[in-house]
């Protein structure tokens, strides 16, 4: 008998019919003797609908964060109650709880709260009594009793946090894909599902644009060593196990995956006086506006001036460009130029630690396709490059083949 935390996302509980299917799956695990805690998101689209209501009533003002948390937290209350009803109908004793009812204690940062502590006594009592415990994801309560929410993707974090608190054998994340792939199968048809991947690799892939798991959930799982498994909600299969182990084998590829992100934009401030502290003068106002900077390149000084280039999320390009124009005037830079038609492609793998020449192999594969590299960033298990967006899919396919990640052709194909 295992203690398993299962998390189902919005598409998995997007209708009564789908909730019935989730109930059937949960019952199969319960019949096999497992103790279960099930974490649910709101129905697909429901959180956005509730936010739109809050915006409509607030008019020209931003919705009050505390009240916004109160309204959006109701989405999960619907799904947890419906699933508990569906399970009881099937003869499986089940009870539903909101985040506040099971004392998922958070800080008071409304709409983006962080989990501080979980009181697991109520859940353990229900499990001991033979009940399936269904918990609302995405939400908690602060020390003053205010409802809080964890931000987008918070249900994944709820699931992992509960698994850590309960010392569960596994946390299963159910999605609309059957695991973590070497890259997006919609771009590379011969991409392969990974049986296993490390937390470190998954964290890099999540931060680089992979949408399978939220970064915070992977960080939490890695910190508390919670085994994670990504599975398809309605298809049977082993999924992908995410653990701390780095298993070496003769057949293990150097690279585990190719990640990419289309939502990048690049800004360059040219003719910057090459003086101490110039990087702070450029990036300080950007940081002050809560704009996240990704990759940074500063050219070698020429005639006591330099060019400074960095990337931001495309949604923040306009705001960053306005700030940079003001900075250019203040520091006496020559001009600001931008580019929103770029993309980032990255190779990720713990095998890079023990193999030399990985970056050059990447650059060679791109050169063979006449793809120009504009920026480069590296870490111990990652190499990222910025290229023209129009070459993105070609680059991903070329790298996938170059690092021998393509699935072998089936017999007869």
Tell where the protein language model's regions lie, with residue ranges.
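Short hydrophobic alpha-helical runs that function as membrane-insertion/retention elements
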Residues: 170-174, 228-230, 294, 375
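Conserved beta-strand segments of alpha/beta enzyme cores
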Residues: 93-95, 227, 292, 372
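Conserved dinucleotide-binding and phosphotransfer motif residues
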Residues: 32, 90, 224, 289, ...
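Acidic-aromatic/histidine active-site loop/patch
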Residues: 221
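A conserved regulatory-domain signal marking ACT and ACT-like small-molecule sensing domains
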Residues: 239-413
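Nucleotide/pyrophosphate-binding catalytic subdomain
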Residues: 1-218, 299, 311, 386-388, ...
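Internal glycine-rich alpha/beta core junctions
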Residues: 231-233, 237
